[in-house]
From Swiss-Prot:
A matching Pfam family: Chorion_1
Annotated spans, Central domain: 56-126
GO cellular component: egg chorion
UniProt protein name: Chorion class CB protein PC404
Amino acid sequence: IGREAIVGAGLQGPFGGPWPYDALSPFDMPYGPALPAMSCGAGSFGPSSGFAPAAAYGGGLAVTSSSPISPTGLSVTSENTIEGVVAVTGQLPFLGAVVTDGIFPTVGAGDVWYGCGDGAVGIVAETPFASTSVNPAYGYGGAIGGGVPYNSYGPIGYGGCGYNALY
């Protein structure tokens, strides 16, 4: 879920800066003080992707799944009027068919690119995440509580998610 679905389009973290979330992998590199190799990608000062791919800034995408017996599939629905050049990026796992429905003007094109390999099946056309920047971690202090440290780790709080010493 992009930050737009949580706080609205174009808004950043609770205190103005992008949230320090590393969308690459939770185990990719050490930059958290508690468990350096398992810092959940949100260490004291870690790479920040801004929580969403660059193409997700148009708002949240509704995802629904339903079945009369049990959930057996995923349906992604977006009912928008789109004008101009459009690029949709990301990876959507699927087995079976992909359907694009709607009116395509006589000028332009509508395509679905997909592929599979190494056990992964999904839509594979992607763009890079937003530019990486360095931002402080979550945690109480500084802006909340008048600078009172959280878990005795200073005014910006404990590196990572702030859950005791686990991460």
